[in-house]
Amino acid sequence: MQLNRKQLKNLHNYKYSAIDNSLLSKYILKPYWWNQLLKVIPMSMAPNLITLIGLGFVVINILTMLVYKYHYEMDAFPSWVYASWAIGLFLYQSFDAIDGSQARRTGTSSPLGQLFDHGVDAINTSFEVLLTIELLQLDMFSSILTQFASLLYFYISTWEEYHTGTLYLSYFSGPVEGIVMVIGLFALTAIKGDSFWLKLHPTPESWGFVRSFLPYYTYGSCLYNFMAFALLLNVLQSLRNALQAVQKNNGSVIKALSGILPYFLQWMAVFSLYAKYPAFFEHHFLTIFCLNAFIFAYSVGVVIVSHITESPFPYWNVLILPFLVDAVDAYTFGVLKNVQTEYFFCYVGICIGVYGNFVAHVIAMITEEYGIKCLTIPSKPESKKN
């Protein structure tokens, strides 16, 4: 992705705006932990490096999961693994929370920080979804649905930020309360074991008609449904905020909503392919999951770039085209039926290449425009004058 001169010039007009209504971060996390952690961070450490180190903790979590699941072929992991997941996610959230403060106190705030932060958050969202799926041992359909819903919330929030110009965090948001809940999920599993979430419990007789169609429940299903409900409320709030901003600026609501269409087109293809080739999804779930993760990360990145450069909204994502082609083929000619494995491995490779190229080019252009480094703070930073 190449940024033209006008887009680069518009970068200098960008001003970060956020509204955080989280009581947890305002009264507990920020004063008693995040502010204290910031004091021990060297002034020489670049904000983006802090963000990247935070992601590194989660990458370690992913590696432990992959080793135990695919090398040792275990579904239930040792307690220390779950404990390390909780610690890793807690550190990720902490580092992600202070990178902006580090940028302000070192005078290195720039649109690159916004792009870098959102890009890392997009990758982390997929990582945490994968860990949660493994912990709760969800079936294939529930696993796909969980990734769809979790990434939808993030995408809608990014779409909302584009139209409102403000990052809005509700009283119960994913980056704060949602992550804290997942940390608690990992920590409790380390103590109780994963069977704690999977054990069947009889529905109380006092629940009346609910007991007639739900005689048993699990703690895992209760947590899953609660988080789904909270996610739905946040999605609806983001839709409301964005559409109000569009109407206030005399924009087209239909045009604004069409910005969400590519996301739903992609996932319609995913679900239709799962219905057609369930065995393939069972054997290659990790491939499909990573594919969706990279497409999502690219989509979010392009939207953020459009936002900070005051560019038109990107209504189309070329990376979803192979998904659509495969879905149409599955229900018509069936040409790709016998080469699904090769097709998707090539597809993943293309997505990684496109996303990597996008990240490298955008970072290079923004750092050159501002005369800065991405992961270091120069001793004498120089700003390029227009």
UniProtKB/Swiss-Prot annotation:
Tell me one GO biological process term: phosphatidylethanolamine biosynthetic process
Q: For this UniProt entry, which segments traverse the membrane?
A: 48-68, 78-98, 136-156, 171-191, 213-233, 253-273, 285-305, 316-336, 344-364
Identify the main location.
membrane
* Lipid bilayer topology: Multi-pass membrane protein
Q: Which InterPro entries match?
A: CDP-OH_P_trans, CDP-OH_PTrfase_TM_dom, CDP_ALCOHOL_P_TRANSF_CS, CHOPT
Q: Per the record, GO CC terms? A: endoplasmic reticulum; endoplasmic reticulum membrane; nuclear envelope
- Key words of the record: Membrane, Transferase, Transmembrane, Transmembrane helix
The places in or outside the cell where this protein is found are:
Membrane
One Pfam family assigned to this protein is CDP-OH_P_transf
Which GO terms label this protein's molecular function in UniProt? diacylglycerol cholinephosphotransferase activity; ethanolaminephosphotransferase activity
Question: What protein name is recorded for this chain?
Answer: Uncharacterized CDP-alcohol phosphatidyltransferase class-I family protein C22A12.10
Species of origin: Schizosaccharomyces pombe (strain 972 / ATCC 24843) (Fission yeast)
